[in-house]
């Protein structure tokens, strides 16, 4: 704990880029949540643009009040 699941449109990231992204996210969580490196997990879930509405409907819109960074768009 914590676990972060990054959802985004498909990107062609190399394994090196994925590793760097995970390291950066982990560093932020260690700094701000006082987590241990061994407690952090990071997932990268790539969602096709035509399937993003489902992410919005199930994960973003219902939790808008709890989001610590809200999107600058609506659906």
From Swiss-Prot:
Coiled-coil positions are none
Q: InterPro entries annotated for this entry? A: 4-OT-like_dom, Tautomerase/MIF_sf, Tautomerase_PptA
Q: Report keywords, A-Z.
A: Cytoplasm, Isomerase
The listed locations are: Cytoplasm
Cellular compartments per GO CC: cytoplasm
Q: Which GO terms describe its molecular function?
A: intramolecular oxidoreductase activity, interconverting keto- and enol-groups
Question: Where, by residue number, is the active site?
Answer: 2 (proton acceptor)
What is the protein's major site of localization?
cytoplasm
* Enzyme Commission identifier(s): 5.3.2.-
Q: Name one Pfam family in it.
A: Tautomerase
Q: How the protein assembles, per its UniProt entry?
A: Homodimer.
- What NCBIfam families does the database record attribute to this sequence? PRK01271.1 (NF002324)
Name the protein family. Belongs to the 4-oxalocrotonate tautomerase family. PptA subfamily.
Q: Any idea what this protein is called?
A: Tautomerase PptA
Tell me what organism the protein belongs to. Answer: Klebsiella pneumoniae subsp. pneumoniae (strain ATCC 700721 / MGH 78578)
Q: Which gene encodes it?
A: pptA
